[in-house]
Amino acid sequence: MKLMNKIIVPVTASALLLGACGSNATESKDNTLISSKAGDVKVADVMKKMGKEQIANTSFSIVLNKVLADKYKDKVDTKDIDKDIKKEEKQYGGKDQFESMLKQQGMSFDDYKEQKKLSAYQKQLLLDKVNVSDKEIKENSKKASHILIKVKSKSSDKEGLSDKKAKEKAEKIQKEVEKNPNKFGEIAKKESMDSSSAKKDGSLGYVIKGQMVDSFEKALFKLKEGEVSKVVKTDYGYHIIKADKETDFNSEKSNIKQKLIEEKVQKKPKLLTDAYKELLKEYKVDYKDRDIKKAIEDSILDPDKIKQQQQQQSQGGSGLTNSGS
């Protein structure tokens, strides 16, 4: 989830610096990082340069990691995390290429695995703290497939058609699908310009309200199971949408619930900050530095500040989905 990833940053160089205060105490009792004839560089010197907000963010990330791991380690299966990482390695062409990509981002394989664990702990926290009823799940989700005919944003684009030709093609496909709804998947595989869904017979899986752009969502949620929409225009082109039969709803319910929780948190960050505050209180987290405490309360635990960060992130656009979650 992007919002939560924004708040819970990976342990970076500043975290290692904080760790130096304790882990290397036997090597340097006065916390000297570098010595020279011109003078020493101590942890305190660097921390002054870093600024309170950066120190607060990193300190909070470390303590939250410890607390979440203690509370939810028995609810997270590390084998599932290993399986996910194996899939990601395959997507990047193997373990060596995957680790090279991580290295370019300043992260080791072990750091990445820890971040994946933390993400799993976060999900457990929100499952505990954010209520989503079965009724909400039913009302706010729909299994969908689509066929997309892309419109070129500029004439030099390799993929897509002119607006006129794209619309004509979409209308022709829509009539064909309306006559033969059982062949939707076959037609999607052949005609759709959304390559990721085309190879799955056009399937988008379960779509959550608020997840897609407005015109797409409105058309989808008007459909009854098995129905096909008229041609729908979005900024990406022309779509033909189908409401699929929800034969796997029970097995997918937990995943749908997780998506709904993420959407709720995107819309109302206070749900997340309240969950953090309850957890910190439960674990008797005590801020020893008043400035650090204020920096954490004014940024990480302030839902309005999180909302601002969220809006800044969304300005870049995120494709067919609204939140990119």
Swiss-Prot record:
This is Foldase protein PrsA. Its EC number is 5.2.1.8. It comes from the Bacteria. Residues 1-20 form the signal peptide. Belongs to the PrsA family. It comes from Staphylococcus epidermidis (strain ATCC 12228 / FDA PCI 1200). Plays a major role in protein secretion by helping the post-translocational extracellular folding of several secreted proteins. One of its GO terms (molecular function) is peptidyl-prolyl cis-trans isomerase activity.
